[in-house]
Amino acid sequence: SNAAYSAYQSGELLMIKAVPTEEIPSFEGREDYYVEPIIGTYYVSLNLNKEPFNIKEVRQALSLAIDRDYVAGTLMQGTYTAATSFMGPGWVDTDGSEFQANANGGKPYMDNSYFEANVEKAKQLLADAGYPNGEGLPQLTYSTNDTGYHKVVAEYLQQAWAEIGVDLKVETVEWASFTPMRRNGDYE
């Protein structure tokens, strides 16, 4: 949070978990800045119980409109890498080595080239689903919170999906409401 960042800058705190996104460039190369591999995977969750997310081609189109390398390298300023499996770097296997080095014979579970941003293919998939240029699709709502990279990623999704004709409304929700909302399926 910005409050924690300010406290760190003033010397009140010795360490903070995250630097505000806009401050990362000023921290790179500093002795007191270190990026630790995150044990987790950043992903977009779609509610498959709601239309149009129950249509495979719509989900594929939304996926192909996302440039994962851009998200990881630019929006997240190199603090993430585009995922090749649901378990990202940092997970340790039983022998102490990195999980990804052993899992699936050391090969990625996913061929990321299949998931490379492809706006034309995404548009075709939407058309195949009955939504040429996004026509007929209702406005979609993406719920997120405003911590860390979430807001920046949500704004990117809004822009990326607009390129294929999808109108996305970004809804910022407090963590205290966000988690129960997700558990109850009250999201798109």
Write out the residue ranges for each language-model feature.
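Extracellular/periplasmic solute-recognition and catalytic clefts
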Residues: S1-K50, D69, G73-T74
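Periplasmic binding protein-like
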Residues: M15, Y142, Q159-E188
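Short, hydrophobic alpha-helical packing/hinge segments within bilobed ligand-binding/sensory domains
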Residues: A4-Y5, E23-I24, V58, V71, ...
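Extracytoplasmic
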Residues: I39-T41, A82, L137
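Structural transition elements
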Residues: T81-D128, D146-K151
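Immediate post-signal peptide segment of exported/extracytoplasmic ligand-binding proteins
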Residues: K56, V119-T141
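Short helix-initiation/N-cap motifs at beta->coil->alpha
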Residues: S1-S6, V19-E22, T147-G148, V170-P180
